[in-house]
């Protein structure tokens, strides 16, 4: 099942991508941390170090921290963010 709905692109998330190697996604409300980790690793061929989740007004957000060997900016480029 596809849990990732779309990347969230704001000034704050772009700074997190550049400085902290994190990508923020809007995800399905039933998604778990493990499911998001597996989907990101499979879809983008990267290694995920950590997943933080929060429920906001507009849905559930997942902040994915990539392993140091991988670049969040490169993944963002592949998604069409940059």
Curated annotation (Swiss-Prot):
Source superkingdom: Archaea
InterPro entries listed in its UniProt record: Nucleotide-bd_a/b_plait_sf, Ribosomal_uL23, Ribosomal_uL23-like, Ribosomal_uL23/eL15/eS24_sf, Ribosomal_uL23_CS
Subunit structure: Part of the 50S ribosomal subunit. Contacts protein L29.
Entry-linked Pfam families: Ribosomal_L23
SUPFAM superfamilies with a match to the protein in the record: Ribosomal proteins S24e, L23 and L15e (SSF54189)
Organism: Picrophilus torridus (strain ATCC 700027 / DSM 9790 / JCM 10055 / NBRC 100828 / KAW 2/3)
Gene3D superfamilies noted in UniProt: 3.30.70.330
A Gene Ontology biological process term: translation
Keyword Ribosomal protein recorded: yes
Protein's UniProt name: Large ribosomal subunit protein uL23
Alphabetized GO MF terms: rRNA binding; structural constituent of ribosome
Keyword Ribonucleoprotein among record annotations: yes
Keywords associated with the record: Ribonucleoprotein, Ribosomal protein, RNA-binding, rRNA-binding
Function summary: Binds to 23S rRNA. One of the proteins that surrounds the polypeptide exit tunnel on the outside of the ribosome.
Gene Ontology CC: ribonucleoprotein complex; ribosome
Family: Belongs to the universal ribosomal protein uL23 family.
